[in-house]
Amino acid sequence: MRPSVFAFLILTPIAAVAAASDGQFSGVSTKGNLSVWRVNHGNGSVSLCSFEGHKNEPQCYPWSAGGQAGNYQIIGGDDVLSTWRINASSGAVSLCEYKEVTDPPICTPWSTE
């Protein structure tokens, strides 16, 4: 195997992990405490996780598209399939919603300041 191909095969997964771990994360539980929305503070992407029964690990669904680097938070709510996110630096908000949990959630454009 050529060194350049070998380096590509080794570095590509490392770059993917670095991109996926952009920033810190937090989350809020939904009503009933059986699901949780999580947010990437660095790029504003959100994802829903849920579980069925204490013997099963949580199942997490695809992440929404991320945005510009910033300081993002999630706003807790009662709806299981949608959540609000806020850019804590600018105050802009956006609503994200799953149409199907097998697809990434669709998010509205950010509000104008």
Segments from the language model and where they lie:
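Positively charged n-region of N-terminal signal peptides that target proteins for export
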Residues: 1-4
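N-terminal signal peptide c-region/cleavage motif recognized by signal peptidases
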Residues: 13-15
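Short N-terminal segments immediately surrounding and downstream of signal-peptide cleavage
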Residues: 20-35
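Short beta-strand motif characteristic of blades in beta-propeller domains
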Residues: 33-41, 82-88
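Primarily extracytoplasmic ectodomains and periplasmic/lumenal surface modules that are beta-strand-rich
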Residues: 45-46, 92
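Tandem-repeat architecture and repeat-register "anchor" residues
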Residues: 49-52, 96
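Trp- and S/T/G-rich repeat-edge/linker motifs of beta-rich repeat architectures
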Residues: 53-68, 102-113
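Short, solvent-exposed interaction modules
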Residues: 61-98
